[in-house]
């Protein structure tokens, strides 16, 4: 009996649905869809409009948003199985949850917090209205989940996963990206790319400014664009974003335009460490002296079958450089742009 209890996935906390409906009633948003199904959302305040945006987003792509949310908690293995072991461990290794919880209040301003909360509140409303599509334990969605989602995913846009995979031998190379790229179009490597650039009036024949928005993303999945138009008394933006992201990360307004692209700048440093024990390292050499690793624990569950999952407990090591990975080729510390950055 103890073994069965040990393997049974913990029951989700009881959800206060009335509270979710009460919170939703404080927002006022209108969603109008054009002939292509693109939502045009109108609200008095930025939070009102973002609430409508979050609801429309959930209507159109709930399953992907749900996958992003469980990834942003480091819990994909509990729902998807052992193929997500590496990514859940990396989530804990990078201490995403700790960074968001410790920096949310101080690193994000009140207006942005209101927008993030509105998006999370909209996700909760849609979910309680469509409970048959919601995995156990996903609700309620919090502001921390939303921020953790893009804090966790951002480094993979400049191919941190490719850098990490190089640490492993070709025979033992894990899939470390939090999500598999998905697309309806399989292009040869030679014609893949992503770019964005601006042309100033001084460099155009007709003295007009041009912004070329040409980021190449999959047709579906967590890296696919979602198009929307959001209007409040203070903003009027049309553009696109990713599942689980409460703002348009590329687009236009009556006064400006902005874009982004996926590329591979030099934003990752990997340090090969001299350690006291390659199999069970507890110290590393730095500036001619031995230093103890900062040690904590990664804990998550891996789906088995039905209501059962297996608990995983694995050590997490940090050096002065950053998080530490033990690979067949050695022990490495990683420092990269965006590590534990919030806001």
Language-model-derived ranges and their functions:
Residues 1-343:
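Mature extracytoplasmic enzyme cores
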């Amino acid at each position: 009996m103890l073994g069965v209890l040990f393997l049974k996935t913990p029951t989700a906390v009881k959800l206060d649905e009335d509270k979710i409906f009460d919170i939703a009633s404080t927002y006022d948003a209108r969603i109008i869809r054009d002939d292509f199904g693109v939502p045009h959302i109108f609200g008095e305040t930025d939070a009102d409009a973002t609430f409508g945006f979050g609801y429309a987003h959930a209507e159109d792509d709930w399953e992907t948003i749900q996958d992003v949310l469980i990834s942003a908690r480091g819990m994909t293995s509990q729902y998807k199985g052992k193929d997500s072991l590496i990514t859940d461990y990396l989530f804990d290794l990078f201490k995403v949850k700790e960074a968001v919880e410790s920096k949310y209040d101080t690193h994000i301003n009140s207006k942005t917090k209101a927008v993030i909360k509105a998006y999370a509140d909209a996700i909760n409303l849609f979910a309680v209205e469509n409970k048959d599509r919601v995995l156990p334990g996903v609700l309620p969605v919090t502001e921390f989940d939303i921020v953790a989602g893009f804090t966790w995913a951002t480094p993979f846009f400049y191919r941190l996963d490719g850098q990490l995979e190089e640490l492993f031998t070709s025979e033992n190379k894990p899939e470390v990206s939090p999500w598999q790229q998905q697309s309806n179009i399989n292009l040869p490597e030679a014609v893949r790319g992503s770019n964005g650039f601006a042309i100033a009036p001084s460099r155009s024949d007709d003295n007009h400014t041009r912004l070329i928005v040409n980021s190449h993303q999959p047709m579906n999945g967590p890296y696919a664009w979602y198009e929307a138009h959001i209007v409040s008394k203070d903003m009027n933006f049309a553009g696109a974003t990713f599942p689980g992201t409460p703002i348009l990360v590329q687009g236009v307004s009556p006064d400006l335009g902005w874009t982004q692209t996926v590329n591979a700048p030099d934003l990752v440093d990997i340090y090969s460490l001299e350690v006291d024990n390659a199999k069970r390292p507890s110290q590393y050499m730095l500036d001619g002296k031995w230093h103890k690793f900062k040690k904590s624990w990664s804990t998550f569950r891996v789906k088995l079958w039905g209501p059962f999952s297996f608990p995983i407990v694995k050590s997490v090591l940090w050096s002065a450089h950053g998080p530490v990975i033990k690979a067949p080729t050695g022990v490495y510390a990683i420092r990269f742009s965006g590590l534990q950055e919030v806001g």
